[in-house]
C-alpha cells in the first residue's frame, strides 16, 4: 500500500506527479482494446472520476490477458503519468506493468449503460460502484463530517443517546417494539395483555423515534449539545420521503429561545451545503447535469439568502389569499402539506422561510405553550424544492404547564418521571431542532427518493441486505 498513490491525489496534485512513475490500484470501469493498444478506465474509490490507463502490446507482457478482462476486475497499474491538456481528461497513465488482483465474472450486473434507480435498489450491495451512488454516498460522508465540524467549532458537546427506549418522544406510538419474550406464547398480565414485567428490560421497550428527551438532560448540564444517530419510525408509509430507519441531527441549547434556535438552524444548513459544494465539486456537477438541472442554482440560492420568517397564522392567510387551488384546502388548524410549504418558499417568499407558532393540537407535548393558549413556540424551516427540512421548538420549561399538556394527550407521567424532574432542578429556557439527515442529502444531491440516499434502506416490506 505504501507505494500506491490515490487517484484523488493525482487529480488534486497533477503537476506533482507529471512525467513520474506512479502505482495505482482499483477496479476496471470500462475497457476497450485492439490488437496493438487499449484503454482502461480505472476507479480506486478515492475520487469520483476515473483514471485513463493506456496500455501497449509492445510494453505489457500479459497484454492478451489484460485486454480480455471483464468489467469490475481489480488491477494494479505501474506507469508514467502524462498530462493531456487537449483531451477530455487532464492526464493519463501510460502503463508499463498491469497486475491482475482479482477477476470479475462476466455476468457482472453493472455494465456500461445507464441503469434505473429501481433496478439498482435490487442490487444495493453493488450500487455504490455506479456513478450516481458513488457520488451520493461520498456526499453523504462529507455532509456528515461537515455537521460534526459545524457543531464542534461552535463548542457543542456530541452526545450519544440510547437506541433502546421506554418512552415515546413524539407521543405518536409508531414505534418498533423490542422484546425477548416468546411471542407465540407470551406471559399474560392479570388485567389481560402481555406482561412486559417478565421481558428483558422489565417494561415495554422500543427503538427510539428521537434522542431529544435524553438530549435535553445533557443540554441542561453542558449548555449546548447535539446528537447524530439512527432513529426508527414504524410508519406504514410507502412514499419517496419515508423510511423506517434513518439518521437524525438533534441539537439542544440551554438559555436559548426560539429565535436562537432558528439562527443556529439557518447557520448550520448554510454551512453544511457550502462545505459539500466546496469539497465535492465533481459530484455536485454530476448531479446538476444528470439528476437535477437546477440543483446548483438552488443550493447557491439557499446559501446566499437571508431566510424569511412568518407565523403559521400569517402563512395560512397568505395561502388562502393567493388564489391558488390546492389539493388539500388550507384552513387554520391543519398541518401544512408539502404543496403548501413549497408554494410559500417558491412562489410567495422565493427563498427559504421559517414558519413559527403552530397550533398546539398538531405539535408534540414538549413544545412551549404560547400566551394565546392555542399555539406553541415551534418552527419549521421550509426550503424551495422540497418544503420542510428542519423542525424544532422552544421546549416547555414550566412544570405545571408541561404536566397539563401531557394530561391532555393522555401521556402517563410515570413513563416520563425523569424528564419532568429536569424542571425541578434549575430549569431554564431551552430549545432545539431535528434535521433528518437523509432529507438533507436528498436536497443537496437532487435525488428524489430516500431509498437512494441510504446505503441499505429499510422501508415498508423491505429489509434486504
UniProtKB/Swiss-Prot annotation:
It is an enzyme of class 6 (ligase). One of its GO terms (molecular function) is nucleic acid binding. Its EC number is 6.1.1.22. InterPro entries: Aa-tRNA-synt_II (IPR004364), aa-tRNA-synth_II (IPR006195), aa-tRNA-synth_II/BPL/LPL (IPR045864), Asn-tRNA-ligase (IPR004522), Asp/Asn-tRNA-synth_IIb (IPR002312), NA-bd_OB-fold (IPR012340), NA-bd_OB_tRNA (IPR004365). Keywords: Aminoacyl-tRNA synthetase, ATP-binding, Cytoplasm, Ligase, Nucleotide-binding, Protein biosynthesis. GO terms for cellular component: cytoplasm. It comes from the Bacteria. It is found in: Cytoplasm. Its main location: cytoplasm. Pfam families: tRNA-synt_2 (PF00152), tRNA_anti-codon (PF01336). The keyword Nuclease does not apply. It catalyses: tRNA(Asn) + L-asparagine + ATP = L-asparaginyl-tRNA(Asn) + AMP + diphosphate + H(+). One of its GO terms (biological process) is asparaginyl-tRNA aminoacylation. Homodimer. Belongs to the class-II aminoacyl-tRNA synthetase family. This is Asparagine--tRNA ligase. It comes from Clostridium perfringens (strain 13 / Type A). The gene is asnS.
